[in-house]
């Protein structure tokens, strides 16, 4: 039976609590923005289907809790992930400094050579910005990973961040995705799915 998509990519949003991971996911998947902040407990996820280079790709995006007490829970979700969006808050120097720790968590728990994207969120707060774009870009370049500044509030680069991540994964996987099948429009499906597995059919 044709599942209606060519590839399934599992993505994880990681980073300190309060950097805006949930807002980025909601903006991308549902397109609302809320000023109210409720910390994620454990993990949450959404499904988003996109079109990329003529392929229908289902993104299973996991939003993880940034608090240290949840790290044991969330680290178990690292296995089988195809890509990580490592998020910090451009107005919070500590959240940027902790990026190295999050990258170590990826190295410890995820597959080797997994795709990563450094994301500086809350770029709309220009007067409160403390992490310079150039500094973050140079750090990302030194790791050989892409970097974007985003704003969940005004949607700047939000879609581009997830599309960049999907494109990087697809490029690393190379040709071989099955062609054909349905071509659904952008849609959200909150049906729970097994966290393991995925990849191109």
UniProtKB/Swiss-Prot annotation:
GO terms, molecular function: G protein activity; GTP binding; GTPase activity
Locations listed in the record: Membrane; Cytoplasm
Functional summary from the UniProt entry: Protein transport. Probably involved in vesicular traffic.
Modified residues ((Microbial infection) O-(2-cholinephosphoryl)serine): 76
One family name in Pfam for this protein: Ras
Primary site of residence: membrane
Membrane topology (UniProt): Lipid-anchor
Gene3D superfamilies in UniProt: P-loop containing nucleotide triphosphate hydrolases
Gene coding for it: RAB1C
Reactions accelerated catalytically: GTP + H2O = GDP + phosphate + H(+)
Post-translational modification: (Microbial infection) Phosphocholinated at Ser-76 by L.pneumophila AnkX, leading to displace GDP dissociation inhibitors (GDI). Both GDP-bound and GTP-bound forms can be phosphocholinated. Dephosphocholinated by L.pneumophila Lem3, restoring accessibility to L.pneumophila GTPase effector LepB. (Microbial infection) Glycosylated by S.typhimurium protein Ssek3: arginine GlcNAcylation prevents GTPase activity, thereby disrupting vesicular protein transport from the endoplasmic reticulum (ER) to the Golgi compartment.
Residue positions bearing lipid (S-geranylgeranyl cysteine): 200-201
InterPro entries in the cross-refs: P-loop_NTPase (IPR027417), Rab (IPR050227), Small_GTP-bd (IPR005225), Small_GTPase (IPR001806)
PANTHER family assigned: RAS-RELATED PROTEIN RAB (PTHR47977)
Motif, Effector region: chain positions: 37-45
One GO term of the biological process aspect: intracellular protein transport
Main EC class the enzyme belongs to: hydrolase
Presence of the UniProt keyword Hydrolase in the record: yes
Record keywords, A-Z: Cytoplasm, Glycoprotein, GTP-binding, Hydrolase, Lipoprotein, Membrane, Nucleotide-binding, Phosphoprotein, Prenylation, Protein transport, Transport
Family: Belongs to the small GTPase superfamily. Rab family.
Protein name (Swiss-Prot/TrEMBL): Putative Ras-related protein Rab-1C
Sequence positions that bind GTP: 15-23, 33-40, 63-67, 121-124, 151-153
């Amino acid at each position: 039976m044709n599942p209606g998509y060519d590839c399934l990519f599992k993505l994880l949003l990681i980073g300190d609590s309060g950097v805006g991971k949930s807002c980025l996911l909601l903006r991308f998947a549902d397109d609302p923005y809320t000023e109210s902040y409720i910390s994620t407990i454990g993990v949450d996820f959404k499904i988003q289907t996109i079109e990329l280079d003529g392929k229908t790709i289902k993104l299973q995006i996991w939003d993880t809790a940034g608090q240290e007490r949840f790290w044991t829970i969330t680290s178990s979700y690292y296995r089988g992930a195809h890509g990580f969006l490592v998020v910090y808050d451009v107005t919070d120097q500590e959240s940027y400094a902790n990026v190295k720790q999050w990258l170590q968590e990826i190295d410890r728990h995820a597959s080797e050579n997994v795709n990563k994207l450094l994301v500086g969120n809350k770029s709309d707060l220009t007067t409160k910005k403390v992490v310079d774009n150039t500094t973050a870009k140079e750090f990302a370049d030194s790791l050989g990973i892409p970097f974007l500044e985003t704003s969940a509030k005004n949607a700047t680069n939000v879609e581009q961040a997830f599309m960049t991540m999907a494109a990087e994964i697809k490029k690393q996987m190379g040709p071989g995705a099955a062609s054909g099948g349905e071509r659904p429009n952008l849609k959200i499906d909150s049906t729970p799915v097994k966290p393991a597995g995925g990849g191109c059919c």
